């Protein structure tokens, strides 16, 4: 294996106009002896940045995959916008922009890994874009139900102008009026709306649930998968996990292993998980995680300095 264990991801910027951009990180394959058919795109969950998935990117790269991560617009991370302006449609636009950008670079064979709220976005578009396969983990299938469980109240039953604007979801201000208005106007809220979008999916598909997930009902995931057209589909359980896949190192390692096994299997057009993968050691994971955090901080400081220069130039 090539000695690239501690190399940083390649930093790309997709210019979408109006001084707005999507930041993308590319991790090259670190096992050049294993040839994979697909590039993996990781869509981070709500309030998760792409550097939060450094470990998963390392697992996949060590098993021969090129890995693409990105931060959504109007979200936490390095792309344009603030999370209080986030909506599901903005997340959809961000994902589609990244997919289009890859295809413009002649990267056409793409497998998508999406977790939590981003999985609902993946379900929205996966049947309409040219993916090789789809993997979801603790994927939201009934957005209204998940929000009610997470927020302890069904705010979507209220008139939009009466919903508190400062709802905190996953430690961040949801920007509830923007988010809820988009949910209703674009039919993001119900299980039926999710099934209507994903039912024509005809590519290999693996969904992972967690047996301790209080936010996503496993029977609803099973109902969704049963309605998917593809004859290559399967559900697996992340035993011992909750909705938080990073709650401890045991759960996190199981998540990395499971996603990587699924990616290797689906790259071969199989839904039965492979038995063996190459695992990076703990020291390498620690170093790359720290290095990516430093890269994130460096880019954030550069962004702040550019904004300050613009303000000074306008005075």
Curated annotation (Swiss-Prot):
Keywords for the protein's UniProt record, in alphabetical order: Acyltransferase, Luminescence, Transferase
Active site: 116, 213, 243
EC number: 2.3.1.-
Gene Ontology terms, MF aspect: acyltransferase activity, transferring groups other than amino-acyl groups
Keyword Transferase on entry: yes
Protein origin, superkingdom: Bacteria
Pathway: Lipid metabolism; fatty acid reduction for biolumincescence
Gene3D superfamilies xref list: alpha/beta hydrolase
Any one biological process term the GO annotation gives: bioluminescence
Pfam families found in the cross-reference section: Acyl_transf_2
Coiled-coil portions: none
Cited function: Acyl transferase is part of the fatty acid reductase system required for aldehyde biosynthesis; it produces fatty acids for the luminescent reaction.
Family to which the UniProt record says this protein belongs: Belongs to the LuxD family.
Record's protein name: Acyl transferase
Source organism of this protein record: Photobacterium leiognathi
């Amino acid at each position: 294996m090539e000695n690239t264990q501690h190399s940083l991801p390649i930093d790309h910027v997709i210019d979408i106009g109006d001084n707005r951009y999507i930041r993308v990180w590319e991790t090259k394959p670190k096992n050049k002896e294993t040839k994979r058919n697909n590039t993996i795109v990781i869509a981070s969950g709500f309030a998760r940045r792409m550097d939060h998935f450094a470990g998963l990117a390392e697992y996949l790269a060590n098993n021969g995959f090129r890995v693409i991560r990105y931060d959504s617009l109007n979200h936490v991370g390095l792309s344009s916008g603030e999370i209080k302006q986030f909506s599901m449609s903005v997340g959809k636009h961000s994902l589609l922009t990244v997919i289009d950008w890859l295809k413009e670079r002649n990267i056409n064979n793409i497998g998508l890994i999406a977790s939590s709220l981003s999985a609902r976005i993946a379900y929205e578009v996966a049947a309409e874009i040219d993916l090789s396969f789809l993997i979801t983990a603790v994927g939201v299938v009934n957005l209204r139900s998940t929000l009610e469980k997470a927020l302890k109240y069904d705010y979507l039953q209220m008139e939009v102008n009466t919903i508190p604007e400062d709802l905190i979801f996953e430690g961040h201000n949801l920007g509830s009026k923007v988010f809820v208005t988009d949910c209703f106007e674009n039919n993001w809220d119900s299980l039926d709306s999710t099934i209507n979008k994903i039912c024509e999916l005809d590519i290999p598909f693996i969904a992972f649930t967690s047996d301790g997930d209080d936010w996503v009902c496993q029977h609803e995931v099973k109902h969704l998968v049963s309605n998917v057209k593809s004859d290559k589909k399967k559900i697996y359980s992340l035993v011992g996990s909750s909705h938080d896949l990073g709650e401890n190192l045991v759960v996190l390692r199981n998540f990395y292993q499971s996603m990587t096994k699924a990616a290797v299997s689906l790259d071969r057009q199989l839904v039965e998980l492979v038995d063996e993968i190459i695992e990076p050691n703990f020291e390498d994971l620690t170093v790359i995680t720290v290095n990516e955090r430093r890269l994130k901080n460096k880019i954030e400081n550069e962004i702040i300095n550019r904004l300050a220069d613009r303000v000074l130039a306008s005075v």
